[in-house]
Regions:
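Selective transmembrane helix interface/packing segments
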Residues: 2-471
């Protein structure tokens, strides 16, 4: 048989380890409506519980009580916060782009609700006599739909920062755009490895492909890359650079109040549940219970799988809360270096290796799960060693007095006493029309020192002239 014929036959045949997508043949419009209402209610209630849980967990980790005064365990505090946001003054900026200023937080919030439409909560169940999967919808490229909606949601942040015509929100929006471009690349590459291993981009098909082993175990590098990228994707510590309080006050949300601010706040927490649900679907078996199914035949049937799915999602959520309590915000250049110089090259290399394994499986027809697991462990050890090796190009590793400039180039020589003025050209961004940045503290100190030196020099010159006259 010719090689081209063999390749065509393998391409047209179903994947050896691919999953089967959910069956929506018996779906009715009112079933879809019930599922949509359930998803919205589930996300809103989950956000309320996540805010309370985060406050309590952070309080415990920081050796303080947390909310515990208003009612039982401080739970009514959430009602007070919601009432405060609703009744706060809703001010409007005079120079803002009014339509986009209102539209931006709505885009950020409603795009977050759209992702759960393709997330499978469980298998086929019976609802009012109709057999239907616990999923609103699914299609062959559902995972790519998630990436598209995630990128669309960033427009809410970018437009919100630009429409205010203010410096801090604009800088936060620019940071958000750079952050999404940087970390969505590595996230997409980690997801592509799952598509290759599963043989499908359908979310329900990916869950079905993990019936025997989770991809988080068989492809540990993909899981680690996704976990780091998802924290950067949702702007959480240590990657919350677009809304860094110490630098940008609140980033793109500085000029928003009342319900417009609440839309951003709601969208941020829903996005945390979105990336947690995708992590569960892609790497943790989705609604399948790997341990309970080994001794309980009915663990992955009926309504029980929804409980396993929610438990996994909350486990990932608690991990993000844990990182917020234990890690500090990293520097922006270190953040970009981690994304472009480490995560993207590592994820691209791992993607190539998984592609080779997938091609081997397509031509041999055998199972490659053990091969993937061994390759993942070896690759993880190699990348850990490379990551821990000292970087000779870092400034702190150079000997004292050394410079990174070329010794033979006279243009690179910088005077040791010359100070760099970061605010010389309107750093960090040019000020809006009609505004001027105040002089930096260094500039003010230099001006005071120059004036003091001039005042000291003038009496000295007068004294010298007087002594010359007396002689």
């Amino acid at each position: 048989m010719k090689p081209l014929t063999v390749m065509t036959a393998h391409a047209s045949a179903p994947p050896a380890e691919g999953g089967v997508a959910a069956d929506f043949s018996a779906e009715t419009w009112w079933l879809s409506l019930i599922k949509a209402v359930f998803i919205v209610a589930f996300l809103i209630v989950s956000v309320i519980m996540a805010i309370w849980t985060e406050r309590r967990v952070l309080g415990r980790m920081q050796t303080r009580p947390g909310p515990n005064v208003n009612g039982f365990l401080g739970i009514p505090q959430l009602i007070a916060d919601a009432a405060k946001l609703i009744m706060k003054e809703d001010f409007w900026l005079r120079g803002a782009e009014k339509f986009i200023y209102i539209l931006a937080p709505v885009i950020a919030a409603f795009s977050a609700f759209m992702i759960y439409a393709v997330i499978p909560f469980g298998p086929q169940v019976s609802i009012l006599g109709h057999s239907t999967p616990l999923q609103l919808t699914d299609f062959p490229v559902a995972a790519l739909y998630v990436l598209a909606v995630t990128g669309f949601g960033v427009y809410g942040i970018i437009l919100g920062g630009w429409s205010t015509h203010s410096t801090y929100p604009l800088l936060g929006a620019v940071r958000s755009a750079a952050q999404v471009i940087s970390y969505e690349l590595s996230m997409s590459l980690s997801m592509l490895t799952v598509f290759l291993a599963s043989g499908t981009m359908s979310t329900s098909g990916i869950v079905a492909a993990q019936e025997r082993v989770w991809w988080g175990l068989a492809m540990i590098p993909s899981l680690l890359i996704y976990v780091v990228s998802m924290v950067g994707e949702v702007n959480r510590l240590p990657f919350d650079l677009p809304e860094a309080e110490g630098e940008l006050v609140a980033g793109h949300m500085v000029e928003y109040s009342s319900m417009k601010f609440a839309w951003y706040y709601l969208g941020e927490y829903i996005n945390m549940f979105n990336v947690s649900a995708m992590c569960t679907t892609l790497f943790l078996g989705g609604w399948r219970s790997f341990v309970l199914a080994s001794f309980w035949p009915g663990a992955n049937s009926g309504w029980w799988p929804m409980l396993w799915f929610v438990a996994k999602v909350w486990a990932v959520m608690l991990f993000m809360i844990w990182t917020r309590a234990t890690l500090v915000r990293i520097r922006y250049d270190h953040f970009m270096k981690l994304g472009w110089k480490f995560l993207i090259p590592v994820s691209l290399t791992w993607f190539v290796l998984v592609t080779v394994v997938r091609a081997y499986r397509a031509f041999s027809g055998g199972s490659t799960r053990v091969l993937l697991l061994v390759l993942a462990v070896v690759f993880l050890v190699a990348m850990t060693i490379l990551f821990l090796l000292p970087d000779g190009g870092r400034e702190e590793d150079r000997p004292e007095g050394a410079s990174g400039a070329d010794e033979d180039s006279e243009d690179d020589v910088v005077a040791p006493d010359e100070e760099f003025d970061a605010f010389a050209d309107g750093f960090p961004v040019p000020p809006p029309p009609g505004q001027r940045l105040p002089p930096s503290p260094r500039t003010r100190r230099a001006a005071v020192a120059t004036a003091a030196a001039g005042a000291t020099t003038a009496p000295s010159s007068a004294t010298s002239d007087q002594e010359g006259t007396d002689d």
